[in-house]
């Protein structure tokens, strides 16, 4: 499971998800990837589950990059606890994802294999996604 080794602040505020991703919104390493279409929190368990789904499908062929990291702690209070008496303890970590963010990248496999692997991974994630390739960004005249 992904989580920071150490953090400056143990508990953080929830915040708001506004606008589109301005960083990490194009393919930097691989030839194919999945890009978020909606905003949301992706937990470290969901990232790990998607990673396993991709790796099981590509079976040792190709290389996978995880482009998001869960660096935000989410606190929870125990069940059946009255309100008050401070903020709960950190229970799990999430990555804040905005529309346009590339979540996973893949290279070294045929496009059909990559497309199916990314489809399997997208079912494990709480945000809507789309399959993207290097060719898509070259046609748009994107940042490269």
UniProtKB/Swiss-Prot annotation:
* Domain of life, source organism: Bacteria
Keyword tRNA-binding in the entry? The reply is: yes
- Tell me the InterPro entries matching this sequence: Ribosomal_uL16, Ribosomal_uL16_bact-type, Ribosomal_uL16_CS, Ribosomal_uL16_dom, Ribosomal_uL16_sf
**What would be one Gene Ontology cellular-component term for the protein?**
cytosolic large ribosomal subunit
Biological process, per Gene Ontology: translation
Q: Which UniProt keywords apply?
A: Ribonucleoprotein, Ribosomal protein, RNA-binding, rRNA-binding, tRNA-binding
Q: Where are the transmembrane segments?
A: none
What are the recorded GO MF terms, alphabetically?
Answer: rRNA binding; structural constituent of ribosome; tRNA binding
Entry-linked PANTHER family: 50S/60S RIBOSOMAL PROTEIN L16, LARGE RIBOSOMAL SUBUNIT PROTEIN UL16M
Assembly and binders: Part of the 50S ribosomal subunit.
General function of this protein: Binds 23S rRNA and is also seen to make contacts with the A and possibly P site tRNAs.
Name the protein family.
Answer: Belongs to the universal ribosomal protein uL16 family.
Q: Which HAMAP family match?
A: Ribosomal_uL16
Designated name of the protein: Large ribosomal subunit protein uL16
Lineage, highest ranks first:
Bacteria, Bacillati, Bacillota, Clostridia, Eubacteriales
């Amino acid at each position: 499971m992904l989580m920071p080794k150490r953090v400056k602040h143990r508990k953080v505020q929830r915040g708001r998800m506004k606008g589109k991703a301005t960083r990490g919104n194009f393919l930097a390493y691989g030839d194919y990837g999945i890009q978020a279409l909606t905003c949301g929190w992706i937990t470290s368990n969901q990232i790990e589950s998607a990673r396993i789904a991709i790796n099981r499908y590509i079976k040792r062929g190709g290389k996978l990059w995880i482009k998001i990291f869960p660096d935000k702690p989410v606190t929870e209070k125990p069940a059946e606890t009255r309100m008050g008496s401070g903020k709960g303890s950190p229970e799990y970590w999430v990555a804040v994802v905005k529309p346009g963010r590339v979540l996973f990248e893949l290279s070294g496999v045929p496009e059909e294999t990559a497309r199916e692997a990314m489809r399997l991974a997208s079912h494990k994630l709480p945000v809507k996604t789309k399959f993207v390739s290097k060719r898509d960004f070259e046609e748009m005249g994107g940042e490269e």
